Amino acid sequence: MRQSPGVSRRALLQRAAALACAGAWPSGADAQALAATTPPSTPPPQGTVPAPYTPRVIDAAGAQADVALLERALKAIHPGLTRRSSAAEMDAGFSSLRASVQGPVGELDFYRELSALLALVRCSHTKAEAPAAFERWRQVHPSHVPLRFRWIEGRMVVVSCADAALPAGSEVLALNGRAVSDWMQTLGRLVSVDGHTPWARDANLADDGDLMGSGFDHFLPCVAGLPKRFELDAVRLGERGASRLSLAPLSFEDWLKLPNGSRTWRANFSEATQWRLLRPGTGYLRVGTFVNYRKPTDAQALFTRAMLDLQAQGARQLIVDLRDNGGGSDDAALALLDHLALKPYTYQRAMRLKAVRYGDLEAHIETWGDRQALFHAPLSQFIRTPEGWYERRAEDHPEHLQPRQPAAAAFGGEVVVLTGSLNASGATMVVAKLQDMGLARLVGGRCGGSADGPTAGRIFTVVLPSSGIRVRIPLVFNHMTVTRYDPRGGISPDVLVEETVEHFRAGHDEVLAQALKTLGAA
């Protein structure tokens, strides 16, 4: 992935991120090319007053032109635009967006309204990136709430805080005079998740490996501005009454240093995959992410090593922990399936595009690879369906569309998979396939994502010329080979275990306890 003239670091990052469902990940040389474009962060000198950020104002004509381009692009390209919201609902969303730009508009206000419209699509891969200058500013200037949290039983529970006066396990009731439940509802309408999965939305507000760490902090400035202090009403651990704390915001770089349990921002597959014998006869395999392009490794070899090691230790049962996994590279996801499969299987039934010709929209699309081959591919590469889809040919995409064989070291014993609300994209595809093939029992929380497949794969980045805001639009509906799924999105486990505040404070893993109970004696 050499950087060609005029291709931004954002384009390179988008290439890597968008390949998550396409199974074509950057090589080591590509990763070096990406790293070479990384600009150094320059923190403000010690003792200086942080420079304020002044949002750019976009004139009405420019904002209206951006909205018109976005509407045209979404309707021409997106294969799932009306999959979870009706055409009438989307038209109402576009009308609301147009109404918000009848006069000059600040870039953060415009970004907020764009995000609200894109969230209506109910696709986690369809979203706008924050204005680039603002994102750079936030890296080293304080704007993040100085804590990490989990949303448990409708309560904001502290995982860690920059101020020792608010220990882990404390509960935040209000932020700057407003109940945190109201903040979650307001900010939640800006978060893109698959289908009607509010549990996934809440999880992404607390943790998001794609945006600036959490949906809550990512979108808060678009609603509340940039306060110099955060006034928190909280019940500190061990106390009964609420206390008022005044906390200074953190830069994104400092916020990332806060402990966050097992969840790592932008984790890598090779580092987030561990295994051990949990008890005699029962193995444990944690796969925290399928992202395998930043530090690529041979996923097949890694899982073969894991399975052989666990079996050598006498494992006859296996717990696969996917709770923190939001998806990633297809090579890692397919390798896990290959090592759990007992017979040949086909991953997807179809890869469908809405269009393969884009007219003058091409001038506004940033992508990677051979543009001639992408925008003017021979029509013979596709099968036109009676419904109007363009389907990719199985012989051109055998890994996804043709039968796969179990790995030689595939685990042949009893399997339980631990699930959670952070599951999305490729992680949900794996869970759906395991459930459909009867290869595992699911224990834990409800998954996000789409069991019948996401709209993902290659992603076009449409650059809105007046605002400069970049919008990600997926090209492909990856239709899974599954016989049952919830059309509203997500997956319900066989044994539903919802985390409680009591268990969190005690450090008790009830999901794992229920998994061991489900397996019984090894």
Protein language model features and the residues they cover:
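Flexible, low-complexity junctional segments that flank or bridge functional domains
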Residues: 2, 32-318, 322-353, 359-370, ...
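Sec/Tat signal peptide C-region and signal peptidase I cleavage site
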Residues: 28-30
